[in-house]
Curated annotation (Swiss-Prot):
The gene is kdpA. Signal peptide: none annotated. It comes from Pseudomonas entomophila (strain L48). GO terms for molecular function: P-type potassium transmembrane transporter activity; potassium ion binding. This is Potassium-transporting ATPase potassium-binding subunit. Its main location: membrane. The system is composed of three essential subunits: KdpA, KdpB and KdpC. Belongs to the KdpA family. It is found in: Cell inner membrane. Part of the high-affinity ATP-driven potassium transport (or Kdp) system, which catalyzes the hydrolysis of ATP coupled with the electrogenic transport of potassium into the cytoplasm. This subunit binds the periplasmic potassium ions and delivers the ions to the membrane domain of KdpB through an intramembrane tunnel. The keyword Membrane applies. Keywords: Cell inner membrane, Cell membrane, Ion transport, Membrane, Potassium, Potassium transport, Transmembrane, Transmembrane helix, Transport. The lineage of its organism: Bacteria, Pseudomonadati, Pseudomonadota, Gammaproteobacteria, Pseudomonadales. It comes from the Bacteria.
């Protein structure tokens, strides 16, 4: 590693961590309807939205009403996007006259963007019109992220409130998350990207003749606005086929820094938002410490692995300081690895290098980040409510070890809460192991892999892990655009999204109804290094140990077979 690499890492952590406490407090004030510096500008817009939609902002909902509103909104978003994708060829703003998508691909794409996964079995510039990108994909990028933030806020209220029957109003939370939480930051990032050379235009594709005399089509489009929310909303779906490796999505080292930092900017800030809800920022610091520890463990492993020369190329007497196959030279190895670890720590899934070309252990780090349930920062809202589930599981385990009824911040965890927690632990195994096993056992679907042996298994394992974790990245050698995989990965994405959201909202309702006992000397502290260590081990053992046999068949076997 060179001095530039260390400066990149320093700048990345500075951009992410320094504004997090301020931004976290801002989100708390916004979601609770308190006045902020944006209120004079966006307040009238917010109130206008309520009047137009007939929403009573003062009427709160219980957890069942909140859940039904969320499900209805997401179903409507899915149906609208599904229709737009099917009818794309007949709609305006389609200068390339691209046809509508085949039904299974349209189903997969609509589910993908509705669940904040952004798994793409297609290439954007060759399959999706400008109108579809804007009113279909970009809109879902906003509202899927806002949905995750709303669920987190509902859980935070459930933990913080005492003897309460309501969690807030989903429509209000959705509106505030979009207007105040996402739009202003996206505007700033989009302008920065345009400054760096990312296109934002409705012009037709450019047809050019190269110096060699061959014809070339250069795709354009309203890219900067979508890329901004793709990153800040932890969505990840690329405007162009190769995502942020494309020079029009990510043209410079500066744009690379802005984009990779923006992936986890909001998730980190929301940890402090939770601290404001429970009136104890020590809880935020403990959770941040655990997240950073997991991130640094995975990042260090990936950096070490990816800077090792590939034995296969060494035997061919190819000189290499670090493997650059599948990477962009303008980002280098460290910039590519940083993005890989960040995008899989969050439920983002965008890439600036080809994950299929990573050394086996680097690819394994990316998979493990997702297999843990995207709790290392995670998606907007989704990452923290996933982490809070592990916090409650760690508290439950601590209670078992010391023989006390487990409690978190004065709320006792009883049979109903533990049942809901256990239900969430089944989400990743069902999506990855069961659906993945079905795909691997059938000769047709298994033929989607492009490599034999361990790496081919890793391609399939990565696909179903990414879908269930609502990440969206892929080993690009996997041929996902088949009816079987479009439907099965679509189901995995639905399981991964709503398999968490439904128990989380039920848990929030259960906790909100409980009385809160004052914490005394006998209470187990959840803000110190002891609990942080317990939480870290709980995540690794309870969340990760399930997948060790499959990892042994994939990236670990490949690593050993290559002779690293």
């Amino acid at each position: 590693m060179h001095s530039y690499d260390y400066l990149l890492l320093l700048a990345f952590f500075a951009i992410v961590l320094l504004p997090a406490p301020w931004l976290g407090r801002f989100y708390y004030k916004v979601m609770e309807g308190q006045r902020t510096w944006l209120s004079p500008i966006l307040g009238p817009v917010e109130r206008g939205c309520y009047r137009l939609s007939g929403v009573n902002a003062d009427q709160e909902q219980n957890w069942k009403q909140y859940t039904l509103a969320l499900l209805a909104f997401n179903l409507a978003g899915f149906l609208l996007l599904f229709a737009v994708l099917l009818l794309q060829g007949s709609l305006p703003l389609n200068p390339q006259h691209l046809p509508g998508q085949e039904w299974s691909l349209a189903f997969n794409t609509a589910v993908s963007f509705m669940t904040n996964t952004n798994w793409q079995s297609y290439s954007g510039e060759a399959s999706v019109s400008y109108l579809t990108q804007m009113i279909g994909l970009t809109v879902q990028n906003f509202v899927s992220a806002a949905t995750g933030l709303a669920v987190l806020v509902a859980l935070s209220r459930g933990i913080a409130r005492r003897s309460a029957g309501t969690l807030g109003n989903f429509w209000v939370d959705l509106t505030r998350a979009t207007l105040y939480g996402l739009l202003p930051l996206c505007l700033v990032l989009a302008l920065l990207l345009v400054w760096q050379g990312v296109p934002q235009t409705f012009a037709d594709y450019v047809h050019a003749v190269t110096l060699q005399g061959t014809d070339q089509t250069i795709p354009l489009g309203p890219a900067a606005s979508q890329i901004a929310i793709k990153q800040l909303g932890t969505n990840g779906g690329g405007f162009f086929g190769v995502n942020s490796a494309h020079p029009f999505e990510n043209p410079t080292a500066w744009s690379n820094l802005f984009e990779v930092a923006s992936i986890i900017l909001i998730p980190v800030a929301l940890v402090f938002t939770f601290g404001h809800y429970v009136k104890d920022l020590r809880q935020s610091r403990a959770i941040i410490a655990c997240m950073l520890a997991l991130f640094l463990i995975g990042g260090s492993t990936a950096l070490w692995s990816e800077h090792q020369p590939n034995p296969a190329l060494e035997s061919a007497q190819v000189r290499q300081s670090a493997p650059l196959e599948g990477k962009e030279s303008r980002f280098g190895t460290t910039g590519s690895v940083l993005w890989t670890v960040t995008t899989t720590s969050a439920s983002n899934g965008s890439v600036n290098a080809m994950h299929d070309s990573l050394n086996p252990l680097t690819g394994m780090v990316a998979m493990v980040n997702m297999m843990l349930g995207e709790v290392i920062f995670g998606g907007v809202g989704a990452g923290l409510y996933g982490m809070l589930l592990f916090v409650l599981i760690a508290v439950f385990l601590a209670g078992l070890m010391i023989g006390r009824t487990p409690e978190y911040l004065g709320k006792k965890l009883q049979a109903r809460e533990v049942q809901l927690l256990v239900a969430t632990l089944l989400v990743m195994p069902v999506g990855v192991l069961i659906l993945g096993a079905i795909a691997a056992s059938l000769p047709g679907p298994a033929g989607a892999v492009s490599n034999p042996g361990a790496h081919g298994f890793s391609q399939l394992l990565y696909a179903y892990t990414s879908g269930t974790a609502n990440n969206g990245s892929a080993f690009a050698g996997f041929g996902a655009n088949t009816t079987f995989h479009n439907v099965m990965i679509g189901l995995a994405m639905l399981i991964g999204r709503f398999g968490y959201i439904l128990p989380v909202l039920a848990l929030a309702g259960s906790l909100a109804a409980k009385k809160s006992a004052p914490q005394g000397l006998n209470s187990f502290p959840t803000h110190g290094p002891l609990f942080t260590t317990l939480l870290l081990l709980t995540i690794l053992l309870v969340g990760g140990l399930t997948f060790l046999p499959t990892l042994a068949l994939g990236p670990i076997a490949e690593h050993l077979s290559l002779g690293f």
